[in-house]
């Protein structure tokens, strides 16, 4: 209702083709549990005769012959193993480790490969470049009434919810991190939304430690949907056990900064709407004194973090 009072429609299905508006998050769940692609698709297929699954296997490189991928090398239970491909190799290690595996295999920017003593199998400078991600800023408010997860996940309430989940597979333990989603256009001339909101009836005292505030709280987190800033992900040694170096380079482009600032202002307006007057006690982070664009940008740089939607690296 608060978003609608600010001029944004309600939207019960943001995957219908019309994305703009606010509504409940759509989730992938079964019987109250978050359902992964492994659960939904891989496990049911494990009995097929043409599928073999190796677990506890760490890929260390792609085998090549004459510029063609012919297999994969991996470590498993302290031993080095290889598998060969009759037709082809599909690399699907995500935006972080796919470029790492390619570079360890000699596929990538020759300057980077030679720096770590890796023979160049195929020069491909784009590997590891073009990294982009959604950058989110958590804005929080204190709530007047005890209706949030901050107090519902403590003491007797938590025990009651645990029992409710155990017997009915319902309740707060089935909730996603944010229960409401919003998609808005920060400028009227653009065709589709450029900011998404994750809205939670909870607030963190310490995000990294996942500690909730002791008082009732609410969080509205905007992120820019189509960032222009680009980072990189590259190996930092020839050792497959070493994690790659990730350079986010978030908010490097002016359009990213302007869009996120406007997204934060919209969140402030929604929290100040009449529909939330009886619920919102005060603005916490950024506080009510932080209003200018420069102040909001400083807050975004200090408190923002990735939503872990990395793409673009190979």
Predicted regions and their residues:
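Short aromatic/hydrophobic-glycine micro-motifs
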Residues: 8-10, 51, 107, 118, ...
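General small-molecule cofactor/ligand-binding pocket signal
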Residues: 11, 52-54, 119-123, 198
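Alpha-helix boundary recognition
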Residues: 4, 43-47, 103, 114, ...
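Structural detector for helix-capping/boundary residues
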Residues: 40, 57, 87-88, 314
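FAD-dependent oxidoreductase catalytic-site/capping-region signature
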Residues: 1-16, 23-25, 144-147, 162-314
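Conserved redox-cofactor binding core of oxidoreductases
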Residues: 1-69, 75, 138-162, 299
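Glycine-rich loop(s) and the adjacent beta-strand/alpha-helix scaffold that form part
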Residues: 62-67, 71-164, 172, 238
């Amino acid at each position: 209702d608060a978003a609608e009072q600010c001029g944004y429609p309600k939207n019960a299905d943001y995957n219908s083709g019309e994305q703009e508006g606010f509504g409940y998050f759509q989730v992938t769940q079964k019987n109250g549990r978050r359902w992964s692609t492994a659960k939904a698709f891989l496990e049911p297929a494990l009995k097929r005769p043409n599928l073999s699954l190796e677990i506890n296997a760490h890929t260390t490189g792609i085998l090549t012959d004459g510029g063609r991928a012919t297999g994969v090398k991996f470590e498993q239970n302290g031993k080095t193993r290889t598998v060969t491909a009759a037709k082809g190799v599909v690399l699907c290690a995500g935006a972080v480790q796919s470029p790492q595996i390619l570079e360890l295999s000699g596929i990538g920017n020759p300057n980077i490969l030679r720096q770590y003593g890796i023979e160049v199998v195929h020069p491909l400078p784009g590997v590891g470049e073009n990294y982009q991600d959604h950058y989110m800023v958590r804005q929080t408010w204190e709530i007047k009434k005890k209706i949030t997860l901050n107090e519902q996940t403590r003491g007797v309430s938590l025990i009651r919810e645990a029992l409710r989940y155990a017997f009915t597979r319902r309740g707060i333990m089935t909730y996603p991190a944010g229960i409401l989603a919003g998609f808005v256009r920060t400028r009227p001339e653009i065709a589709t939304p450029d900011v998404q909101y994750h809205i939670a009836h909870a607030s963190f005292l310490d995000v990294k430690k996942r500690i909730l505030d002791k008082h009732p709280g609410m969080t509205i987190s905007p992120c820019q949907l189509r960032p222009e800033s680009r980072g990189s992900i590259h190996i930092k040694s020839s050792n497959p056990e070493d994690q790659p170096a990730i350079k986010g380079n978030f908010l490097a482009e002016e359009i990213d900064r302007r869009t996120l600032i406007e997204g934060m202002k919209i969140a402030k307006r929604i929290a100040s709407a009449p529909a939330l007057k009886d619920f919102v006690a005060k603005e916490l982070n950024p506080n009510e004194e932080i209003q200018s664009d420069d102040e909001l940008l400083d807050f975004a740089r200090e408190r923002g973090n990735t939503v872990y939607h990395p793409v673009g690296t190979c």
